[in-house]
Amino acid sequence: MDARTHRRAAGTPRALAERAGRRCCLGWDFSTQQVKVVAVDAELNVFYEDSVHFDRDLPEFGTQGGVHVHKDRLTVTSPVLMWVQALDLILGKMKSSGFDFSQVLALSGAGQQHGSVYWKTGASLALSSLSPALPLHQQLQSCFSISDCPIWMDSSTTAQCHQLEAAVGGAQALSCLTGSRAYERFTGNQIAKLFQKNPEAYSHSERISLVSSFAASLFLGGYSPIDYSDGSGMNLLQIQEKVWSQACLDVCAPHLEEKLGSPVPSCSVVGTISSYYVQRYGFPPGCKVVAFSGDNPASLAGMRLEEGDIAVSLGTSDTLFLWLQKPMPALEGHIFCNPVDPQHYMALLCFKNGSLMREKIRDESASCSWNKFSKALKSTAMGNNGNLGFYFDVMEITPEIIGRHRFNAENMEVSAFPGDVEIRALIEGQFMAKRIHAEGLGYRVMPKTKILATGGASHNKDILQVLADVFGAPVYVIDTTSSACVGSAYRAFHGLAGGTGVAFSEVVKSAPQPSLAATPNPGASQVYAALLPRYSALEQRILSTAQRPLE
């Protein structure tokens, strides 16, 4: 026990700092619109950040929002060399600003999830023999079998999704196996489409990377493995056993396992930095590269979620990040391997009717005023005297319902509510739906549960009070402007400290704490214990009577 305690202490950022001046870890984020980097010192302070914006800084690639939307409006790609050149640019900016690369102990990063990169046969040789005299993009120009990579916004693979679900026994069976039913943007379906439409490009690909493992490969000067967490967004990885599903691979394309390589735990050190960066920029030769992961898993690390915690991003869409011990895969949401604890899981749930719906009800029922909106929440009772509402002006995805549906305390549908009742019905309904669907994936509120709120509506204390009451847990607010980057730097420290043998929470305990915004009112748990089953039953009633729109 003593030895272990000592080993943990030796690996904490502070102990690392004592051994060497202002050492740091870098966190990278290869997102849809930009490449961003932060440097985090051993006290876990961010002391440097920079970015390259694709549309603005690399206009020659002709992207809008970092992407090309094709004529069919379904196919969406990004040029792989744009990502490579962005890395050249950002490292050049860091060098000219005097950034001291010699102090970098380790780096990790994040990539937009699901996107895929196809390395041409012979590319590994080019990667391993880079000349420090030239930028990357000049040396890697002929290394890719397709120049435009499918990304998460692509929805052109419906046929391949049907094929995959049919082959493994249906959508629920695929979800139990891989954590999600078949989604058009998921990598396995994109690979299947490439194999079917362009078998030559597929056969000329010696390695297929995710955006995350592609970026890590650039730093390694060799192919980086895919990590378990980002690998969970492919419809290919068995999330329980953490191996590729042979059944899924066989449906998608031949020889796929050798093109993907073996997946690794997300906190693995995958190697040391390529000599290219040592000679061109002055990185230390011992600088470690920790497996890159997806942007959502990296954000979970950046928000420092722990077991039982939940993060609620209240934006245009509302997104839930859950930490799960025992996942129950469903037809909705996504379950991934947890990026900071390989024994556990994380889940993502997306709700389309987010801030725009809140703003609409504010305009209709509170004369366009957030103050009046807040006043309505304060002047109405928890539980809204049994009045419940569903507000889906656009087709919701969790669950698939459209329209507004209001019910009184007797479960009778009514056509309208008074303004203040409408406002509380909206906010209570949005948060009850989140709790019900989270619990549907295996989430349970625990005594130590914290809720981390981010996004626009997290600035409204009265909305957060309802969130605390519905979940029966304290709500904290946290700044997440660079959470994927910062989370990647934290993950680099974690990998450096020993990865799986060390608790992530131990490594990041000195990071800035979130601030408490709301605690549940007395009696809240009794009120919502009665309302939640009613809300769930009414949701089922609406679902069963809803006419599915014609597709």
Swiss-Prot record:
Question: What Gene3D superfamilies does the entry give?
Answer: 3.30.420.40
The regions listed as transmembrane in this protein's record are none
Alphabetical keyword list = ATP-binding, Carbohydrate metabolism, Kinase, Nucleotide-binding, Transferase, Xylose metabolism
Which reaction(s) are listed as its catalytic activity? D-xylulose + ATP = D-xylulose 5-phosphate + ADP + H(+)
Question: GO MF terms on file?
Answer: ATP binding; D-xylulokinase activity
Name the positions where ATP binds.
370, 456-457, 460
* Enzyme Commission code(s) on record: 2.7.1.17
| Name of the top EC class for this enzyme | transferase
Pfam family of this protein, just one? Answer: FGGY_C
Q: Where is the signal peptide?
A: none
Residues annotated as binding substrate are 114, 185, 295-296
Gene Ontology BP annotations: D-glucuronate catabolic process to D-xylulose 5-phosphate; D-xylose metabolic process; xylulose metabolic process
The intrachain disulfides are: none
Q: Does the keyword Cytoplasm apply?
A: no
Subunit organization: Monomer.
What PANTHER family does UniProt report for this protein, alphabetically? Answer: SUGAR KINASE (PTHR10196), XYLULOSE KINASE (PTHR10196:SF57)
Q: What does this protein do?
A: Phosphorylates D-xylulose to produce D-xylulose 5-phosphate, a molecule that may play an important role in the regulation of glucose metabolism and lipogenesis.
The similarity annotation says: Belongs to the FGGY kinase family.
Q: What is this protein called?
A: Xylulose kinase
Which organism is this entry from? Mus musculus (Mouse)
Supply the source organism's classification.
Eukaryota, Metazoa, Chordata, Craniata, Vertebrata
Point out the gene that encodes the protein.
Xylb
